[in-house]
Amino acid sequence: MFDIALRSGPARGGVSHRVRTCDTVDGGYQCFPRLSHRWGQYSPYFSLANTGLPSEVPEKCELTFVQVLSRHGARYPTASKSKKYKSLIQAIQANATAYNGQSVFLRAYNYTLGSEDLTSFGEHQMINSGIKFYQRYAALTRDHVPFIRSSDSSRVVASGQLFIQGYEQSKAQDCDADHSQDHAAINVLISEAPGANNTLNHNTCAAFEADKLGDQVSAKYTALIAPPMAQRLHHDLPGVTLTDDQVIYLMDMCAYDTVATTPGATSLSPFCALFTDTEWSQYNYLQSLGKYYGYGAGNPLGPTQGVGFINELIARMTHSPVHDHTTSNRTLDAPGADSFPTNRTLYADFTHDNGMIPIFFALGLYNGSDPLPHDRIVPATQADGYSAAWAVPFAARAYIEMMQCGRETEPLVRVLINDRVAPLKGCNVDQLGRCKRSDFVNALSFAQDGGDWAKCGVSSK
């Protein structure tokens, strides 16, 4: 069973409307969890607060700094994928001589999905994310305005703006907040143009961009799991012949159709019933493999794509200039530049899943796991908390906190990924997953040394 909440939707033309939604501020998306929490990076954000260490701020601790790193909200397929999905549906309808079992709906299904932009549900996700950030960190948000950056993709910028809408909505309702301050706004847009230095987006490491390891591993696993599914679908759809990739496209449609059909994603797409429970576990692992070997530790240059952001994070946490020769923009990050202050208490950055995965691995958050095997499922609970659905769902968010506790002489650092405390690696971690700031910074030597940027074949700008 699941609960469907009512909330105010984004104002359009000055009119706010009520929306039935499966997304809540605290819990994220909790409808159809046996399926929706296994859609890899296409899963809508769901809270992992109850999967590990306590996520509350410990007693006798006072927060002094928070950085949020967020993925955009749920979107329509990319333009290239949307074209493939539509062509597949048309081919099925042109060739099927019958529609048996769960495939009956395909006879009359009309593909109407857009491309690239946020869905209405994705918009609501980001408003909720802003509300949650304000409320979770009210001790700071009442009196401090976050410094906000966004990669300049339209859906990422829109996500940042909607986050701000939720944030300011909560602040306006908080009687204890300082209402004399300026409203939060996106302070810096960072170009995603090819070759532009951008710590929130990979595109400047030539050797990495040319690498196809993630695609190769995904293709190998797809060839393992898709044929039995295709055999069943061919029985249900006589006259139709599906490739392995097309089987996966039909699985993709389950998630995309669900987050697009209703504003609150309250209706499960009929595409979902085409596949079994076991097959959804396989699909989830397929997506995890793709991210791990495409952008994470499975790729020799994956974590290197995240070191620029880590070096910016160090600068923010230590109130010092950025020391980086990889993806940072030296003009934007110049010492004393208004575009990169290091004296703020709150920071927010908005990007894509493929921008976040390298950052998480550059932080070493999943270093407690062996490399993911290509031929069997290793769930997140056995992979140091890593899976695509647990790490980078739609509207994913990482919180990096500093807190002053009791008689400690320096602040402690803690990282939460979708509300799950990710115990830090490489430093003297305590029972709550935290390290002292100096120890945390020292543990980030991979980033401070530039990772393996020398293997990229380019020089930073």
Swiss-Prot record:
Signal peptide extent: none
Cysteine-cysteine disulfides: C22-C31, C61-C405, C205-C456, C254-C272, C427-C435
One GO location term (cellular component): extracellular region
Molecular-function annotations in GO: 3-phytase activity; acid phosphatase activity
EC top class, as a word: hydrolase
Catalyzed reactions per annotation: 1D-myo-inositol hexakisphosphate + H2O = 1D-myo-inositol 1,2,4,5,6-pentakisphosphate + phosphate; 1D-myo-inositol 1,2,4,5,6-pentakisphosphate + H2O = 1D-myo-inositol 1,2,5,6-tetrakisphosphate + phosphate; 1D-myo-inositol 1,2,5,6-tetrakisphosphate + H2O = 1D-myo-inositol 1,2,6-trisphosphate + phosphate; 1D-myo-inositol 1,2,6-trisphosphate + H2O = 1D-myo-inositol 1,2-bisphosphate + phosphate
Enzyme Commission designation: 3.1.3.-, 3.1.3.8
Binding residues annotated for 1D-myo-inositol hexakisphosphate, in chain numbering: Q41, Y42, R71, H72, R75, T78, R155, K291, H352, D353
Thermal characteristics: Optimum temperature is 55 degrees Celsius.
Main location (coarse class): secreted
Glycosylation sites: N95, N110, N197, N329, N343, N367
Keywords for the protein's UniProt record, in alphabetical order: Disulfide bond, Glycoprotein, Hydrolase, Secreted
UniProt note: pH dependence: Optimum pH is 4.5.
Known uses: Phytic acid is the major storage form of phosphorus in plant seeds and, thus, in seed-based animal feed. Phytases are therefore of considerable economic interest.
Posttranslational mods: Glycosylated.
Function field: Catalyzes the phosphate monoester hydrolysis of phytic acid (myo-inositol hexakisphosphate), which results in the stepwise formation of myo-inositol pentakis-, tetrakis-, tris-, bis-, and monophosphates, as well as the liberation of inorganic phosphate. Myo-inositol 2-monophosphate is the end product.
Similarity section: Belongs to the histidine acid phosphatase family.
Name of the protein described by the UniProt record: Phytase A
Gene of this entry: phyA
